[in-house]
């Protein structure tokens, strides 16, 4: 076996390859793209927005039960990209951690602490042989009492960070470069601008004009810090506004 080849090293999650890589963790990042979806999160002046594609794989499915947006606490929501079952498991764990925090300390968990906690748990999955990393990426949004709107993302390796805008999924690279250009020009977006930037980003990189039933939008604003998912009618209003501007 040549030293450069990866044979034998991707069997075990806890073994470094000679190049110093953990192959199983790298494969987990590839698994995020298995779902074939892309998600985008953008932070505005007084709001944070998450947008993701909504694909109903089967004509017989009830489309109202297909979602990638989850409410973790009253004020924190997330978008999950990647393997659906892993995503649900991570959301369940996040809800447990948030409830536990509230019980212990008597106040709601801040977004960054929740993201840190989930990232810490993911990191343990990369260390133990009997566990497998989750093939999903979580982007959290919420309004912090001191910092204002927050967007946090954590990945299967246990890395987490706050963002002005970020993306996950198949077209992550394209979305990121689109958002970088947008953020460079201007950053203090109003609520409408934030939602529309996120939708434009998604429709540009995927080069499709969305119908309201094909995307999901989750928002938190400073005026109304409760996480809520926009209805199709509200999404339609934003899409119409975008179409008129073009």
Curated annotation (Swiss-Prot):
It is found in: Cytoplasm; Nucleus. GO terms for molecular function: endopeptidase activity; NF-kappaB binding; purine ribonucleoside triphosphate binding; RNA binding. One of its GO terms (cellular component) is mitochondrion. CDD domains: proteasome_alpha_type_6. The modification Phosphoserine is found at residues 17, 63-64. Glycans are attached at residue 5. GO terms for biological process: positive regulation of canonical NF-kappaB signal transduction; proteasome-mediated ubiquitin-dependent protein catabolic process; proteolysis involved in protein catabolic process; regulation of inflammatory response. The modification Phosphotyrosine is found at residue 159. Keywords: Acetylation, Cytoplasm, Glycoprotein, Nucleus, Phosphoprotein, Proteasome. The 26S proteasome consists of a 20S proteasome core and two 19S regulatory subunits. The 20S proteasome core is a barrel-shaped complex made of 28 subunits that are arranged in four stacked rings. The two outer rings are each formed by seven alpha subunits, and the two inner rings are formed by seven beta subunits. The proteolytic activity is exerted by three beta-subunits PSMB5, PSMB6 and PSMB7. Interacts with ALKBH4. Belongs to the peptidase T1A family. Component of the 20S core proteasome complex involved in the proteolytic degradation of most intracellular proteins. This complex plays numerous essential roles within the cell by associating with different regulatory particles. Associated with two 19S regulatory particles, forms the 26S proteasome and thus participates in the ATP-dependent degradation of ubiquitinated proteins. This is Proteasome subunit alpha type-6. It comes from Homo sapiens (Human). The gene is PSMA6.
């Amino acid at each position: 076996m040549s030293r450069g080849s990866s044979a034998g090293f991707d069997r075990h999650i806890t073994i470094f390859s000679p190049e110093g890589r953990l192959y199983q963790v790298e494969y987990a990042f590839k698994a995020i793209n298995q779902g074939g979806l892309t998600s985008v999160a953008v932070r505005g002046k007084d709001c944070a927005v998450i947008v993701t594609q909504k694909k109903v794989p089967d004509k017989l499915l009830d489309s109202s039960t297909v979602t990638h947006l989850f409410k973790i606490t009253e004020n924190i929501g997330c978008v999950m990209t990647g393997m659906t079952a892993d995503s649900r498991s991570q959301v369940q764990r996040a809800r447990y951690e948030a409830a536990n925090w509230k019980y212990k300390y008597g106040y709601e968990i801040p977004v960054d602490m929740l993201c840190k906690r989930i990232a810490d748990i993911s990191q343990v999955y990369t260390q133990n042989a009997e566990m497998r990393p989750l093939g999903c990426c979580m982007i959290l949004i919420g309004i912090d009492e001191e910092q204002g709107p927050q967007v946090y993302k954590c990945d299967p390796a246990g890395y987490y960070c706050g963002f002005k805008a970020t993306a996950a999924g198949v077209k992550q690279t394209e979305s990121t470069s689109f958002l970088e250009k947008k953020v460079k020009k201007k950053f203090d977006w109003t609520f409408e601008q934030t939602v529309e930037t996120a939708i434009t980003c998604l429709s540009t990189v995927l080069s499709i004009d969305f119908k309201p039933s094909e995307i999901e939008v989750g928002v938190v604003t400073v005026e109304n810090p409760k996480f809520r998912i926009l209805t199709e009618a509200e999404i339609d209003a934003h899409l119409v506004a975008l179409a008129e501007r073009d």
